[in-house]
Design a protein with these regions (language model features):
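Accessory DNA-engaging acidic/polar modules
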Residues: 1-85
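Walker A/P-loop
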Residues: 93-115
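Conserved helicase ATPase core of P-loop NTP-dependent helicases/translocases
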Residues: 133, 144-157, 335-339, 344-350, ...
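Conserved helix/coil segment N-terminal to the catalytic DExD/H
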Residues: 151-181, 192-197, 387
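A short beta-strand element within the Helicase C-terminal
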Residues: 177-180, 383, 390-406, 411, ...
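Post-DEXD/H (motif II) to motif III coupling segment of the RecA-like Helicase ATP-binding lobe
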Residues: 188-247, 265, 272
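Conserved helicase/translocase motor-coupling segment
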Residues: 285-363, 367-369
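Conserved segment of the helicase C-terminal RecA-like domain
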Residues: 418-447
Length: 454
């Protein structure tokens, strides 16, 4: 008799098919000489079971340790039509796949509907502790059950549990058999190196990925890890009815003659170095190559200083700071989020305009205090670098000002999403401040290559 076992993030298949039956090829399984059995990554569990059932080969399943639950939704609300469509599409894909919905449109409600339907032990994986806390609270209020938590110094495993990607990667080798349903929030993180292990080492037959921005520049996808994209709506599909209506405005900022000369000189030094060494900054490895080569010579160190100088001139030009002050005055009755590309720019703006600032260096208690003050309108504006791009609910924000940013389409769409939470009479507005005739122009064009900006 065949026996399936879960061992260290993998499925072991022991024994042989009964006489008269032929064991079919099992998906992703290969013979492990040391263990004397077939072995496959745990993610292949459902496919292996399906293959054996179809071939009518009997087996003993010692792998799965998850429970059938009896969850009741405490205060069910009518789903929006697109949420019902998303669940229908996911169900049609046998409970595996990715749902793409804009920030603020109710992705988490889709997840609650899926949990209530499948009634299996469920693990929710999220990228940040802030998001983990939001899921923890939402699961508890929705189902009225104790919720497990792994991460941030906690380690309590229950039939409904929330964890971070980092903790899931570390613990899935021994927890991967305890959940029949796994939800990956912000699942565009999932294909990244170690994070993929969290999906590969889990045997959950049912999987749901949630994201507003599924595309990755490295070409990796999540079909094997969680399933294909089964449903998709963009910001433009939902704006006005389910998301706030919005406008975007790009403001051209000019350098002074003196700043222009300094920028051109620094830019020239930097460009000369990367051209001399044939460094392609558009390639995924370009930045790492530049760092490595610039550290090895005086010429390279000068190129790195020049690179930082030209960025500083473009990111925080005096005219840009002046226009930012104008916008702060113009929108003094609104709730604003000011985004920058780096911490130095964020701290400079915070000092100049006496605004609270949140970066990855901000302590949890201080960050919580600032966000509560923003919600209570004690603070009319907050400054941040990248840490608020995703995973923090700021429903009162209605104006975003992009002082600087990367060329990432995902980042730009995420920043727009911060201000699109629907509220009666709300008209959201995103400003992008771009220093003319600098690399910012090209970066702006790249990041605005999305339907939300057309």
């Amino acid at each position: 008799m065949l026996t399936l076992r879960f061992v260290s993030g993998s499925i072991e298949v022991h024994g042989e098919a009964p006489d008269g039956l032929t064991l079919p090829p099992l998906p992703h399984a290969a013979h492990d000489d040391r263990a004397g059995c077939l072995r496959a990554p745990a993610v292949a569990y459902a496919d292996i079971v399906r293959t054996l059932v179809r071939a009518k080969v009997p087996f003993i399943d010692e792998a799965r340790r998850y429970e059938q639950l009896d969850l009741k939704v405490r205060a069910a609300r009518e789903p929006r039509p697109f949420q019902t469509e998303a669940i229908d599409a996911w169900r049609a894909a046998h409970g595996r796949g990715v749902v793409v919905l804009p920030t603020g449109s109710g992705k988490t409600h889709v997840a609650m509907m899926a949990i209530a339907e499948k009634q299996r032990s469920t693990l929710v994986v999220a990228p940040t502790l802030d998001l983990v806390r939001q899921w923890y609270d939402l699961l508890g209020s929705t189902f009225g059950h104790p919720i497990g938590l792994i991460g941030g110094g906690e380690h309590k495993v229950l039939p409904l549990t929330v964890t971070t990607y980092d903790s899931a990667h570390l613990h899935m080798d021994h927890l991967g058999s305890r959940f029949g349903f796994v939800i990956f929030d912000e699942c565009h993180h999932l294909p990244s190196g170690a994070y993929a292990h969290a999906a590969l080492a889990c045997l959950a037959p049912f999987r749901l990925g949630l994201t507003a921005t599924p595309e990755r520049t490295d070409g990796r996808d999540f079909r094997t890890l969680v399933g294909p994209i089964v449903y998709r709506k963009e910001i433009g599909d939902l704006a006005g009815e389910y998301l706030a209506s919005y406008d975007t405005e790009t403001i051209a900022i000019s350098l002074s003659a003196e700043e222009r000369a300094a920028y051109d000189e620094a830019r020239g030094t930097y460009r000369a170095f990367i051209e001399k060494h044939h460094i392609r900054m558009g390639d995924p490895a370009g930045w790492g190559t530049f760092i490595r080569l610039s550290a090895g010579s005086t010429e390279g160190q000068e190129a790195m200083r020049a690179y930082r100088r030209q960025r500083e001139l473009a990111f925080t030009a005096p005219a840009k700071m002046q226009y930012l002050g104008h916008l702060l005055h113009q929108h003094r009755g609104d709730q604003l989020i000011i985004f920058t590309q780096d911490n130095a720019s964020a701290y400079r703006i915070a000092r100049e305009f006496l605004l609270p600032v949140i970066t990855h260096q901000t302590k949890v208690r201080e960050r919580s205090h600032i966000l509560k003050g923003f919600t209570a309108r004690t603070y009319g504006a907050i400054v941040t670098s990248k840490v608020l791009n995703e995973g923090v609910d700021v429903p009162d924000a209605s104006v975003a000002i992009i002082v600087s940013g990367s060329g990432s389409v995902r980042e730009h769409v995420q920043r727009l999403g911060r201000i699109l939470r629907k509220r009666a009479g709300k008209q959201a507005l995103l400003y992008e401040l771009v220093t003319e005739a600098t690399a910012e122009g090209y970066v702006s064009e790249r990041r605005r290559d999305h339907d939300a900006y057309r």
